[in-house]
Amino acid sequence: MVNIRPDEISNIIRKQIEQYNQEVKVINIGTVLQVGDGIARIYGLDKVMAGELVEFEDGTVGIALNLESDNVGVVLMGDGLSIQEGSSVEATGKIAQIPVSDAYLGRVVNALAQPIDGKGQIPAYEFRLIESPAPGIISRRSVYEPMQTGLIAIDSMIPIGRGQRELIIGDRQTGKTAVATDTILNQKGQNVICVYVAIGQKASSVAQVVNTFEERGALEYTIVVAETADSPATLQYLAPYTGAALAEYFMYRKQHTLIIYDDLSKQAQAYRQMSLLLRRPPGREAYPGDVFYLHSRLLERAAKLSSQLGEGSMTALPIVETQAGDVSAYIPTNVISITDGQIFLSADLFNAGIRPAINVGISVSRVGSAAQIKAMKQVAGKLKLELAQFAELEAFAQFASDLDKATQNQLARGQRLRELLKQSQSAPLAVEEQVATIYTGVNGYLDVLEVEQVKKFLVQLREYLITNKPQFVEIIRSTKVFTEQAEIILKEAIKEHTEFFLLQEQK
């Protein structure tokens, strides 16, 4: 008979009790009632929060947006074609966030920050919420440093500062994207991180922009976030927030960033589609009531941080498309009221060959001259006034046949100044070249030339200055002031080059 040892048995039982570890796992699950058009209605999910991510059986992720008494309205981040009625859905307990790191520079990603350029995974160990709160009043300081765009018309008359939000608005095919991409090209060597967000664009257009950045060496300091026209509405709606989160990562690390949203009209349309499918009540132009908040919470994230937070900045250039120049439509008026000014691009000017087609009369920068270097203020002060007077005179001159000499001179000067503002695409100018160009026009040195000769003359003058008078460039760069010495050097250069140019043209 086997001996039973009670102490041994009790030891074994005690050990088993000590090792016993019961885990209580609570999972918040629901059932799909209906799915279609990028929207799913879920029964259950009682404890789900607004904006929480939910996961379907097939791995598709969605965002819970509508919390109703008997069901939850979820927008899908994918096509949702393999989701079936009756399948289960699990709440994740997380809200949308993306990985962030320096390795994102030079890459093209989607709205979930996943690479779509075929260059492999992006290493990242830090996460940021896609929707993070904007900096408060105490965290900010007023804008005081210039963000040079490389376009004479903007840098002289509608200056943009670091931390500002300046809207680019105009009809389709007026060069809105060109203004934005030129600004990115001009940040080369300026220690500015750029983020270009393409929302609902044609894939070919995005590829063209990326190609331009690559050719011009701008991709190394740029991140492209792209959700093309065939992407689900949810991802088009999220893309700008993803771009802002990537830019914020650098802003809070004491760096200057520039973000371009191309364009917010498409984001508003994607949001309208989601809202209508979720059966939210439509408002003006069928947009939901909170479409203003959609854009305001995005654009308020652009800021110039205070010295306690490291003086980083995020400058936003949102783009909005108008229909037949109607600036009083719903989305344009909303975004105009949120931003610190707007650059208005006119189809008439574009078709008349004035490019960039900036309508200087109704474009404004509400930060203004705080965002200009002193040298630019000194030479460009008279430019806007002269152009405004010229526009008025030009309209008047169409009816009057015999004009006095002074009026004829003013018209001639205006035509040359307008010519001076024309620039080729992807050819941004350094600020010292702009100062020299404007000084030449405003002080009447172009009056001796024919209007057709102005562009050629200015291109050659800028080359002449850089090669023969490098001290001029050095003075403007180092002092940021248009000193007497700089003026003497510039006058000399203009005089020498004008003589040479006129001789050359006579041949």
UniProtKB/Swiss-Prot annotation:
Which residues are listed for ATP binding in this entry? Answer: 170-177
For the site Required for activity, which positions are given?
363
Question: How does the entry describe its membrane topology?
Answer: Peripheral membrane protein
Q: Name one GO molecular function term.
A: proton-transporting ATP synthase activity, rotational mechanism
UniProt GO cellular component terms: chloroplast thylakoid membrane; proton-transporting ATP synthase complex
UniProt keywords, alphabetically: ATP synthesis, ATP-binding, CF(1), Chloroplast, Hydrogen ion transport, Ion transport, Membrane, Nucleotide-binding, Plastid, Thylakoid, Translocase, Transport
Q: Which domain of life is it from?
A: Eukaryota
* Localization, UniProt: Plastid, Chloroplast thylakoid membrane
Q: What is its EC number?
A: 7.1.2.2
Task: Say which family it is in.
Answer: Belongs to the ATPase alpha/beta chains family.
Its subunit composition reads: F-type ATPases have 2 components, CF(1) - the catalytic core - and CF(0) - the membrane proton channel. CF(1) has five subunits: alpha(3), beta(3), gamma(1), delta(1), epsilon(1). CF(0) has four main subunits: a, b, b' and c.
Task: Please give the function described in this protein's UniProt entry.
Answer: Produces ATP from ADP in the presence of a proton gradient across the membrane. The alpha chain is a regulatory subunit.
Q: What is this protein called?
A: ATP synthase subunit alpha, chloroplastic
Q: Which organism is it from?
A: Anthoceros angustus (Hornwort)
